[in-house]
Protein backbone atom coordinates (compact mmCIF):
# COMPACT_ATOMS: atom_id res chain seq x y z
CA UNK A 1 0.00 0.00 0.00
CA UNK A 2 1.28 3.47 -0.88
CA UNK A 3 0.03 6.70 0.73
CA UNK A 4 0.79 9.91 -1.11
CA UNK A 5 0.73 13.19 0.74
CA UNK A 6 2.79 16.25 1.38
CA UNK A 7 5.54 16.29 3.97
CA UNK A 8 7.04 19.72 3.37
CA UNK A 9 9.91 19.52 5.87
CA UNK A 10 11.31 16.48 4.05
CA UNK A 11 10.22 17.21 0.47
CA UNK A 12 11.73 20.64 -0.03
CA UNK A 13 15.40 21.49 -0.02
CA UNK A 14 16.79 17.94 -0.07
CA UNK A 15 19.85 18.78 -2.15
CA UNK A 16 21.25 15.68 -3.81
CA UNK A 17 18.07 13.64 -3.30
CA UNK A 18 17.49 11.02 -5.97
CA UNK A 19 14.05 10.22 -7.31
CA UNK A 20 13.48 6.47 -7.32
CA UNK A 21 10.74 4.46 -9.05
CA UNK A 22 7.91 3.57 -6.68
CA UNK A 23 7.19 0.28 -8.43
CA UNK A 24 9.75 -2.45 -8.82
CA UNK A 25 9.68 -3.53 -12.49
CA UNK A 26 9.72 -7.23 -11.62
CA UNK A 27 7.03 -6.96 -8.95
CA UNK A 28 3.67 -8.53 -9.56
CA UNK A 29 2.33 -7.33 -6.20
CA UNK A 30 -0.91 -5.42 -6.43
CA UNK A 31 -0.46 -1.91 -5.13
CA UNK A 32 -3.32 0.15 -3.79
CA UNK A 33 -2.67 3.88 -4.06
CA UNK A 34 -4.55 6.51 -2.05
CA UNK A 35 -3.91 10.22 -2.63
CA UNK A 36 -4.39 12.24 0.57
CA UNK A 37 -3.46 15.79 -0.30
CA UNK A 38 -5.01 18.82 -1.90
CA UNK A 39 -8.31 17.43 -3.05
CA UNK A 40 -11.34 19.68 -3.06
CA UNK A 41 -13.51 19.75 -1.20
CA UNK A 42 -10.81 18.57 1.20
CA UNK A 43 -11.90 17.05 4.49
CA UNK A 44 -9.36 16.17 7.15
CA UNK A 45 -11.94 13.87 8.75
CA UNK A 46 -12.74 12.10 5.46
CA UNK A 47 -9.02 11.52 4.90
CA UNK A 48 -8.64 10.22 8.47
CA UNK A 49 -11.59 7.85 8.12
CA UNK A 50 -10.37 6.58 4.74
CA UNK A 51 -6.90 5.95 6.17
CA UNK A 52 -8.40 4.13 9.19
CA UNK A 53 -10.36 1.87 6.83
CA UNK A 54 -7.09 0.58 5.40
CA UNK A 55 -5.34 0.11 8.73
CA UNK A 56 -4.05 3.52 9.86
CA UNK A 57 -3.58 3.73 13.63
CA UNK A 58 -3.60 7.11 15.32
CA UNK A 59 -2.52 7.87 18.89
CA UNK A 60 -6.04 7.59 20.35
CA UNK A 61 -7.46 4.57 22.11
CA UNK A 62 -5.08 1.88 23.28
CA UNK A 63 -2.10 3.27 21.42
CA UNK A 64 -0.86 5.48 24.27
CA UNK A 65 2.65 5.71 22.90
CA UNK A 66 2.46 9.50 23.19
CA UNK A 67 0.02 11.80 24.97
CA UNK A 68 0.65 14.98 23.03
CA UNK A 69 0.67 18.38 24.72
CA UNK A 70 -0.47 21.47 22.87
CA UNK A 71 -2.45 19.57 20.23
CA UNK A 72 -6.17 18.94 19.78
CA UNK A 73 -5.92 15.78 17.68
CA UNK A 74 -3.81 12.64 17.62
CA UNK A 75 -3.66 11.69 13.95
CA UNK A 76 -1.49 14.21 12.10
CA UNK A 77 2.27 14.64 12.28
CA UNK A 78 2.75 11.50 14.37
CA UNK A 79 5.74 10.00 12.55
CA UNK A 80 8.26 12.12 14.43
CA UNK A 81 7.98 13.91 17.74
CA UNK A 82 10.13 16.79 16.56
CA UNK A 83 7.68 17.83 13.80
CA UNK A 84 5.59 19.67 16.34
CA UNK A 85 8.43 22.01 17.32
CA UNK A 86 8.38 23.40 13.80
CA UNK A 87 4.67 24.08 14.21
CA UNK A 88 5.16 25.62 17.66
CA UNK A 89 7.79 28.07 16.39
CA UNK A 90 5.04 29.60 14.25
CA UNK A 91 3.30 30.48 17.51
CA UNK A 92 6.16 32.49 18.99
CA UNK A 93 6.62 34.35 15.68
CA UNK A 94 3.02 34.85 14.53
CA UNK A 95 0.73 34.02 17.48
CA UNK A 96 -0.83 30.89 15.94
CA UNK A 97 0.34 27.35 15.26
CA UNK A 98 -1.03 23.90 14.35
CA UNK A 99 -3.82 23.95 16.94
CA UNK A 100 -5.35 27.02 15.29
CA UNK A 101 -4.95 25.40 11.84
CA UNK A 102 -6.70 22.19 12.89
CA UNK A 103 -9.40 23.97 14.92
CA UNK A 104 -10.27 26.10 11.87
CA UNK A 105 -10.49 23.02 9.64
CA UNK A 106 -12.68 21.18 12.15
CA UNK A 107 -14.95 24.22 12.55
CA UNK A 108 -15.30 24.51 8.74
CA UNK A 109 -16.24 20.83 8.60
CA UNK A 110 -18.82 21.22 11.38
CA UNK A 111 -16.93 18.95 13.81
CA UNK A 112 -16.42 21.88 16.21
CA UNK A 113 -18.43 25.01 16.79
CA UNK A 114 -16.66 28.35 16.42
CA UNK A 115 -16.71 28.80 20.21
CA UNK A 116 -15.22 25.32 20.76
CA UNK A 117 -12.48 26.04 18.22
CA UNK A 118 -11.62 29.35 19.91
CA UNK A 119 -11.52 27.75 23.37
CA UNK A 120 -9.33 24.85 22.21
CA UNK A 121 -7.00 27.23 20.39
CA UNK A 122 -6.67 29.62 23.32
CA UNK A 123 -6.07 26.73 25.74
CA UNK A 124 -3.57 24.73 23.66
CA UNK A 125 -2.00 26.78 20.88
CA UNK A 126 0.78 28.25 23.02
CA UNK A 127 2.00 24.92 24.42
CA UNK A 128 5.15 23.25 23.12
CA UNK A 129 5.05 19.49 23.63
CA UNK A 130 7.93 18.63 26.00
CA UNK A 131 8.58 15.26 24.34
CA UNK A 132 8.73 16.93 20.93
CA UNK A 133 11.09 19.59 22.27
CA UNK A 134 13.40 16.98 23.83
CA UNK A 135 13.44 14.94 20.61
CA UNK A 136 14.06 18.02 18.48
CA UNK A 137 16.93 19.22 20.68
CA UNK A 138 18.42 15.72 20.81
CA UNK A 139 18.26 15.45 17.00
CA UNK A 140 20.15 18.74 16.66
CA UNK A 141 22.60 17.96 19.45
CA UNK A 142 21.62 21.04 21.46
CA UNK A 143 20.37 21.48 25.01
CA UNK A 144 16.84 22.58 25.79
CA UNK A 145 18.34 25.61 27.53
CA UNK A 146 20.11 26.57 24.28
CA UNK A 147 16.83 26.12 22.39
CA UNK A 148 15.01 28.34 24.91
CA UNK A 149 17.68 31.02 24.54
CA UNK A 150 17.32 30.98 20.75
CA UNK A 151 13.53 31.29 21.08
CA UNK A 152 13.97 34.16 23.55
CA UNK A 153 16.08 36.05 20.98
CA UNK A 154 13.62 35.58 18.12
CA UNK A 155 10.16 35.67 19.70
CA UNK A 156 7.85 38.33 18.27
CA UNK A 157 7.45 40.49 21.37
CA UNK A 158 4.90 42.71 19.63
CA UNK A 159 2.50 39.76 19.75
CA UNK A 160 3.89 37.34 22.36
CA UNK A 161 4.97 37.78 25.98
CA UNK A 162 5.55 35.48 28.92
CA UNK A 163 2.72 34.95 31.38
CA UNK A 164 3.29 34.85 35.14
CA UNK A 165 4.27 31.16 34.86
CA UNK A 166 6.93 31.86 32.22
CA UNK A 167 4.94 30.46 29.27
CA UNK A 168 4.94 32.28 25.95
CA UNK A 169 1.41 33.45 25.14
CA UNK A 170 -0.29 35.93 22.91
CA UNK A 171 -0.61 39.19 24.79
CA UNK A 172 -4.37 39.31 24.25
CA UNK A 173 -4.83 36.00 26.14
CA UNK A 174 -3.66 37.03 29.59
CA UNK A 175 -4.32 39.99 31.81
CA UNK A 176 -1.07 40.27 33.78
CA UNK A 177 1.78 40.78 31.33
CA UNK A 178 5.36 40.99 32.59
CA UNK A 179 5.47 44.64 31.52
Per-range role (PLM):
Residues 1-179:
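Nucleotide-activated chemistry modules centered on ATP-dependent adenylation/adenylyltransferase
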Amino acid sequence: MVFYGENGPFEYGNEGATELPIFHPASDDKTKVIWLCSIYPYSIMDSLNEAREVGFKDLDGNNHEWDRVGQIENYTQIDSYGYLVHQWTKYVKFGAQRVADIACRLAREGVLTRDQAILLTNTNDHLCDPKAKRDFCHSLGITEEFFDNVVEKHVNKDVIDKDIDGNWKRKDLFKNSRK
